[in-house]
Design a protein with these regions (language model features):
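Basic, polyanion-binding surface patches
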Residues: 1-174
Length: 174
């Protein structure tokens, strides 16, 4: 028997990859948040979309600077994922709090997170008002992955990519 879903409809589309979304302020102050709402929307040209709460500091920064980076972690960074998903970067240095090290990105000012196995650097092409979120369409400027964990365009089982099930539940891609 099928049950009517009235709230949390997005759970029907989970699991989703959990990742770090990095951004930067106009005066080059880096920021990071945990996110799971992203998807590719075009292969040619390569475009991804991330959806971020309008109330978040991250949304404010992305609207200002028109760029972001998707950083794909392994389960080794699970503790940092939880920290970066529970506090705001407005008044807290989440990188320091979560023990994350910043690396300079290849093509954008938003930082890359050391220890992640993949990175997608984006420039915002379009922003759409999407309910309580902004949907940021990002032109992919640069994308790269650790060849130890990605072969022939696919993640290996050793990558153990965290997948968000909804709420406080995470499983690992194997």
């Amino acid at each position: 028997m099928l049950k009517q879903i009235k709230s949390d409809i997005y759970h029907l589309l989970h699991p989703k990859m959990a990742f770090f979304l990095t951004s930067v302020s106009k005066n080059d102050k880096p920021n990071v948040m945990t996110c799971a709402w992203a998807t590719p929307v075009s292969e040619e040209p390569p475009v991804v979309i991330v959806c971020v709460s309008k109330e978040s500091y991250t949304a404010e920064l992305i609207k200002q600077t028109k760029e972001f980076v998707i950083n794909i972690p392994t389960k080794k960074l699970l503790g940092a994922l939880w920290i970066c998903g529970k506090i705001s970067g407005r008044d807290t240095d989440k990188f320091k709090r979560a023990g994350l090290k910043i690396i300079k990105a290849k093509k954008v000012k938003s930082p890359v997170i050391d220890g992640c196995v993949g990175h997608i650097e984006c420039k915002v092409w379009k922003t759409v008002d999407a309910g309580e979120c902004y949907a940021f369409f990002g032109n992919v400027i640069s994308a790269y992955a650790d060849e130890k964990y990605m072969r022939n365009g696919l993640w290996t089982k050793e990558a153990e990519i965290p997948l968000h099930l909804g709420g406080a539940r995470i499983v690992y891609f194997r």
